Structures are given as C-alpha cells and as structure tokens.
C-alpha cells in the first residue's frame, strides 16, 4: 500500500463507507491529487479503470496511467477527459487549490452522466476548530502550525449554499470522520470536546474531516 500523509484511517473509511456503493469492475475513475497512489490503489483493487492525476508523478508508486495537471488551471478537466468518469475522487485536495469553486466546476466537467465525485477536506466547522477560531482568530489545520499548502478552508454552509450551486453540483451524501470524535486534538481536549458536542448546536460538530459525495445538477 502506498504511503499517505492523510489522517489515519480516512482512506479506509472512504473505502468501506463510500466506495463500496460506487466502485465496481470496469467503472472509469480518476483520482485527483493522487500523490503516491493510496486512493488510486483502492480504486484499482475494486476493479475500476483508474487514471491518476496530480501536479507531477514524483513518488507515484503504482503501475497505472498518470497525467500531470495543475488543479489551479481554469480548465484542467480538458486534459483528463470531459464527461467520461463515473467516479471522481479527490482526497484532501480542495483545501490546496486557489479557487475551490473553479475546482468543483472542473469536477462537474469530468463527470459522466450519473457519475459521482467523492471529496474529503479538513472539517473547519468542528467544535475544536470553532474554539480555536474564537480564541485565536486562526483556522484549525491552516495556521502556522498546520500544513503550509492548506490555503482554502471549506465551510459546510458555504459549500452547500454557494459553492455547489455555482459549480453545477449538488450534495448526495455527507459523512464525517471520525464519526464520534477527533484524532487531531490531544486526548484530553478531544474528550472535553466530545462532551461539549452534546450541548453545542450546529452542523458538523464532530469529526476532523468532511466527506462529500457530489453529483451533477444536470
């Protein structure tokens, strides 16, 4: 299995809870931001016809087709194929791009009729993130202690009301990982936050990551 730097268990969770519904033998799939190939490998094991795509193939560890593409380009979908993929995956990618809505529009262009896209991104709506912003004015996983290439936080409310309609997409399924807590917080903090989550109102209180299953509005 290729090495990955995403939260431990996230790929397995997506595999078990999402890909089981959409990945099938012969399904044409593209993995955006493939990195070393952790998700592309899972798609391959499901029997999908997989294309991997990232800024470069450096470190890509699989014997699969790979296309080098810059996701900040306004029409990167044209390099991969329009309306041909039944399954698009982008695991922890959208937070790295300069224009999330443009990225989503390209995903819509990639989708074949009836296809779905599976995206994950840090949950900046979760309770620890809300406390961090309240106390410091900084966004969890995106401050000076976080990943330096995280530049575009995705808030669920904005995604649902603004980003997706503007991109021509709609939400089919929304999951959170982990479902009952937090991996990125210290154990003592995570315990307190889990207790507080029972009384604090709001969407997406638990979980370090959003998982979105999207489909075209057309």
Segments the model singles out, each with a brief description of its role:
Residues 119-140:
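Conserved class I S-adenosyl-L-methionine
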Residues 102-113:
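A short glycine-rich, Lys/Arg-flanked "PGG" loop and its adjoining helix->strand segment in the class I
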Residues 98-102, 129:
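Short N-terminal helix/helix-N-cap motif within the alpha/beta-hydrolase-1
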Residues 140-159:
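Acceptor-substrate binding/catalytic loop of class I
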Residues 24, 98, 112:
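Short conserved AdoMet
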Residues 1-83, 87-91, 101-104, 119-121, ...:
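Conserved N-terminal segment of class I S-adenosyl-L-methionine
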Residues 92-96:
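A short His-aromatic
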Residues 159-175:
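A SAM-dependent methyltransferase catalytic signature shared across enzymes that methylate proteins
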